[in-house]
């Protein structure tokens, strides 16, 4: 239960500022879904991360917030990663006049802060966040859970680990759980926990040049 988790990549790394969201949207044919009226409306996505700043692109669609780290009441993000993830998932593009829009701009978001300002956290906090989601999934209409964090190390590479059992419990409760694979692959044992679960959707990069 004391296992340490971290973000799947360092958000403070000094790299050229580029946006790949629009290119990815073309790759997965988001526009086709939009023409059918599928924008995420009516679906709440829970994001287990560093929290969420009430950004103008989605501030009126944060339907729930919990802070299991500092126990503060209102939405905030002292790291930035959780806000970044919420923007990719459900940003409206309002600030950029529609130029940078998330994948599901009509969805609502339930942000659960399980990581601290440095992007680190514990398995216990992630499990507490999953418990919060399960308790409120019907009330908030949560159907999807995004977890862009993970734990490396052979000790965590077990389907009997508490983290894997936690995400499996969410899946068995009818939630679609999407977890980051990590950034150390492709190589044996490079997928982080809880991405090793056989039940969840574990996602890695689809383009080596991104």
Question: Where do the protein language model's features map onto the residues?
Answer:
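Acidic glycine-/aspartate-rich tracts in secreted/extracellular proteins
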Residues: 50-53, 207-208
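Substrate-binding/access-modulating region of protease and related hydrolase catalytic domains
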Residues: 114-199, 205-210
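N-terminal domain-start motif of subtilase-like serine proteases
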Residues: 2-46, 66-80
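Hydrophobic residues in beta-strands of the RecA-like P-loop NTPase core, especially within AAA+ ATPase
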Residues: 47-48, 181
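Short, well-ordered amphipathic alpha-helical segments that serve as non-catalytic structural scaffolds
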Residues: 25-28, 92, 127-130
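Subtilisin-like serine protease catalytic core
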Residues: 34-45, 52-64, 72-124, 140-143, ...
């Amino acid at each position: 239960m004391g296992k340490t988790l971290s973000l799947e990549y360092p958000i403070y790394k000094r790299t050229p500022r580029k946006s790949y969201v629009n290119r990815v949207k073309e790759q997965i044919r988001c526009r086709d879904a939009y023409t059918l009226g599928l924008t995420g409306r009516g679906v709440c996505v829970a994001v287990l991360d560093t929290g969420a700043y009430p950004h103008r692109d989605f501030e009126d669609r944060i339907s729930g917030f919990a802070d299991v780290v500092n126990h503060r009441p209102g939405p905030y993000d002292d790291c930035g990663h959780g806000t970044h993830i919420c923007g990719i998932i459900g940003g409206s593009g309002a600030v950029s006049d529609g130029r940078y829009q998330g994948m599901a701009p009509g969805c609502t978001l339930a942000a659960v802060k399980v990581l601290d300002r440095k992007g680190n956290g514990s398995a216990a906090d992630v499990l507490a966040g999953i418990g919060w989601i399960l308790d409120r999934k019907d009330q908030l209409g949560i159907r999807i859970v995004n977890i862009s964090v993970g734990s490396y190390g052979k000790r965590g590479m077990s389907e009997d680990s508490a983290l894997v059992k936690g995400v499996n419990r969410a899946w068995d409760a009818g939630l679609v759980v999407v977890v980051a694979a990590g950034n150390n692959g492709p190589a044996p044992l490079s997928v982080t926990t809880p991405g090793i679960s056989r039940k969840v959707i574990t996602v890695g990069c689809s383009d080596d040049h991104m």
